[in-house]
């Protein structure tokens, strides 16, 4: 069946009249227009190359697991071990005060070395909408100083604690804001099995899933769900990679909750 599908794919491509319609000056996206059986459509050259040379990858559903409030000694380290075994990358939204704890420095260094994405969850885990603009900026600056002292300079996105964000916060922070499309509510005392079952039942292609790596049950449930969904054909990636795969530009001051097909 797979060989037949691949053959059909290339027959369709052979029938397509492909025309490069815009060169994309100054770093703009390059697009390809194509005609298949009389109909016209358009996709980026990046996406077209993916379909042409990696048709199986284009079909694969993707999910981004995200973990807030850490790191926590022992718990986050166990999670990193399990992710390494599976060659899975996730996104960690760290609290700056946690990063300043000596016992967490090596864990954060390992996150970066293992290829995980590191984002900001403020220094004190405060509700950003209650702060002045100067206080908001100080929270982010103090966080960045704590984390960059461990892993060096890097670009980052912010996840405001409690998901509380408004236009004023977005303008003040001037970085991408990452929220979520699936909330596991793992902080309510759920068991690992309950967390896993919820993720498995609710997760779909393009979702950004909210978890916390300060609870043993949460990281255990995440790994259980990970194994189940990988068997079903899902790939797990960082938030940045999820958005990039869908050709969704990551822009400062913009809020992202998921990455649906086509960037919707």
Residue spans for each PLM region:
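N-terminal pre-catalytic segment of deacetylase/amide-hydrolase enzymes
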Residues: 1-65, 71-87, 102-106, 226-228, ...
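Acidic/histidine-rich helix-loop elements
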Residues: 33-41, 94-97, 102, 127-133, ...
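Acidic/histidine-rich, surface-exposed loop or edge segments in extracytoplasmic proteins
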Residues: 60-67, 120-126
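Hydrophobic "anchor" residues on beta-strands that sit immediately upstream
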Residues: 64, 117, 208
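Active-site metal-binding loops of divalent metal-dependent hydrolases
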Residues: 67-70, 97, 122, 213
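Catalytic domains of cell-wall/extracellular-matrix polysaccharide-remodeling enzymes
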Residues: 78, 113, 125-256
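Acidic (Asp/Glu)-rich catalytic clusters
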Residues: 79-87, 102-121, 173-174, 198-201
């Amino acid at each position: 069946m797979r060989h037949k599908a691949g053959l059909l794919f290339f027959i369709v491509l052979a029938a397509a009249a492909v025309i490069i319609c815009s060169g994309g000056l100054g770093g703009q996206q390059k697009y390809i227009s194509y005609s298949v059986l009389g109909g016209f459509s358009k996709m980026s050259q990046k996406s077209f190359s993916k379909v042409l040379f990696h048709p199986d990858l284009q079909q694969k559903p993707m999910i981004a697991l995200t973990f807030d409030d850490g790191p926590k000694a022992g718990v986050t380290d166990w999670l990193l071990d399990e992710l390494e075994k599976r060659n899975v990358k996730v996104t960690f939204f760290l609290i700056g005060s946690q990063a300043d704890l000596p016992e967490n420095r090596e864990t954060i260094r390992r996150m970066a070395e293992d290829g995980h994405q590191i984002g900001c969850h403020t220094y004190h885990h405060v509700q950003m909408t209650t702060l002045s603009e100067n206080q908001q900026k100080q929270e982010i600056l103090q966080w960045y100083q704590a984390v960059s002292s461990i892993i060096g300079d890097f670009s980052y996105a912010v996840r405001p604690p409690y998901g509380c964000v408004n236009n004023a916060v977005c303008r003040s922070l001037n970085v991408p804001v990452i929220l979520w499309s699936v909330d596991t509510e793992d902080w309510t005392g759920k068991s690992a099995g309950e967390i896993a079952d919820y993720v498995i039942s609710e997760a779909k292609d393009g979702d950004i899933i909210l978890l916390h790596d300060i609870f043993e049950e949460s990281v255990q449930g995440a790994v259980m769900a990970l194994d189940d969904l990988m068997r079903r054909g899902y790939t797990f990636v960082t938030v940045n990679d999820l958005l990039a795969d869908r050709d969704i530009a990551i822009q400062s001051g913009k809020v992202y909750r998921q990455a649906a097909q086509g960037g919707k």
